[in-house]
Amino acid sequence: MTSVLGLLKPLKKAIAAIAVLVLCIGCVQAPTISENPWQEIDLNTDSTFANIAFTDDLQHGWLVGTKETLFETTDGGKTWAERVIDLGDEKESFTGVSFSGQEGWITGRPSILLHTDDGGEHWSRIALSSQLPGAPYNITALGPNTAEMVTDLGAIYKTTDGGKNWKALVEGAVGVARTIERSADGKYVAVSARGNFYSTWSPGDTEWTPHNRNSSRRLQSMGFNGEDKLWLLARGGVVQFSDDTNPDNAEAWSEPVTPQYRNSVGLLHIGYRTPAELWAVGGSGSVVVSKDGGDTWFRDAALEEIPTNFYRVVFLNENKGFILGQQGVILRYDTSTEAA
């Protein structure tokens, strides 16, 4: 009996060691890319940036953020100059910006809508109704005098006369939203303020369609990949994609992946450089990339020491992209250096 117990002790130790090894595999960080394709730009502001857009001249763009922050570039985003629009004594935060040609729009809280038809040389303010459900969250320029605006309660409006009149596209609001994203073909996805459910809307729908989250983890944000496929980010840096085998089922999702392998780090937004290459950004300088549609991921370790959270990544095309952070920090995608 003693000899049997003596054999069991080493066996138990071996099993325990294997269990620890298995658990630690999930703690290992993702591999790193060999070269960093992002250039850090520090602007003279302590604001958090919300969005970025360019005119039909990709050298000329605008950047908006909290505290009425507005910056303009005329060299493709290499350098930026701060611009000031007199909004009186109101304390506003700009939330969205969009251009179609030289015509542009800026939204802001609590009730700001600005319009330009000369690339931003002159901005005019458009009065919004006091009955507007929620505050302007974002806007999409669609063509001459045409734009679509969404509020933080999910009310969607469209103008075809330069902002003089607006038509409601949805009868009911979705409730306070954490994030709202629009696809190129006009679909929307909104994450609830607490992250416990999400809602979708397609052109022609009269109401938003609610969907339960697919796990116990609260949702951080959702969006589209440019090809009508949804991505999802949940607490702990978890990434999922709508299931290709069920394109019409908004509740069918791929297996969850954790690119950072660090549950304490949250990812907040995804941007697609190409249909296969996507970048995810988040807290504590987190930037990760996948070049196979989201199956495998690599860290950009060169950016992890930047003392900021990254909230949004935007690609205008394969060669021009930006990551927006806080405390005046943005990153510019520089094609002179390619990621591995």
Curated annotation (Swiss-Prot):
Keywords: Lipoprotein, Membrane, Palmitate, Photosynthesis, Photosystem II, Signal, Thylakoid. This is Photosystem II assembly lipoprotein Ycf48. Part of early PSII assembly complexes which includes D1 (psbA) and PsbI; not found in mature PSII. Binds to the lumenal side of PSII complexes. Interacts with YidC. A lipid is attached at C27 (N-palmitoyl cysteine). A factor required for optimal assembly of photosystem II (PSII), acting in the early stages of PSII assembly. Also plays a role in replacement of photodamaged D1 (psbA). Assists YidC in synthesis of chlorophyll-binding proteins. A 7-bladed beta-propeller torus, about 55 by 55 Angstroms, with a depth of about 25 Angstroms and a central pore. One of its GO terms (biological process) is photosynthesis. Belongs to the Ycf48 family. The keyword DNA-binding does not apply. One of its GO terms (cellular component) is plasma membrane-derived thylakoid membrane. It comes from Picosynechococcus sp. (strain ATCC 27264 / PCC 7002 / PR-6). Disruption phenotype: Deletion has no effect on PSII activity. It is found in: Cellular thylakoid membrane. A lipid is attached at C27 (S-diacylglycerol cysteine).
